[in-house]
């Protein structure tokens, strides 16, 4: 039996953050409490996240993950891939609050995906199918290329890198929601050019502050307009080390 890990202060923090986003977490608080307990227990064994305190986990994992719901781009019964999920963020909070989403959390580190799989089962999340692998490989596989309605990612790479990794996985008309910190004009321009190169375009740039903490965030929404050229994504590691239209040393959060 997983103990109730959310203190009254933690529950209030979760409610305030969700309220700021126009979301109702009240029916799901027990799942978030169990998720916190599981994350803390798993972190002791597996070193899953640098965030340790209840406040940091609630704000910077739970609430931060839910900000990807801004704009309504994830509202629907979408087949959705979480690119670079790590310990399951934003996939697990999204699965809790949006059970209609069909989520595939992707990470190259098996221990993290094993944790996500076990945690989803413990939380009763039947809409989560974790996958071990790299986006470069999945993006060139017949099973995954062009098969997703939505891709979501939180701050895992520079925007041009994310565009090359995410857009090949989307069907034409699909949408990629990327969450990053403050975004420079240079990175945005490179991301716009990279998106065009791999078959898409940026349709929305939404700067905002994280509820409660006030940390700066940016949601960038890209739409896939045409099939991605066969040469993209490039082989493993190349998109990160040789980003399209962007010097690797310039990469930011």
From Swiss-Prot:
One of its GO terms (cellular component) is cytosol. S-adenosyl-L-methionine binds at residues 84, 89, 135-136, 154. Coiled coil: none annotated. This is Ribosomal RNA small subunit methyltransferase G. Its EC number is 2.1.1.-. It is found in: Cytoplasm. Specifically methylates the N7 position of a guanine in 16S rRNA. Pfam families: GidB. The keyword Repeat does not apply. The keyword Cytoplasm applies. One of its GO terms (molecular function) is rRNA (guanine-N7-)-methyltransferase activity. The lineage of its organism: Bacteria, Thermotogati, Deinococcota, Deinococci, Deinococcales. Transmembrane segments: none annotated. SUPFAM superfamilies: S-adenosyl-L-methionine-dependent methyltransferases. Residues 228-253 are annotated as: Disordered. Keywords: Cytoplasm, Methyltransferase, rRNA processing, S-adenosyl-L-methionine, Transferase. The gene is rsmG. It is an enzyme of class 2 (transferase). Belongs to the methyltransferase superfamily. RNA methyltransferase RsmG family. It comes from the Bacteria.
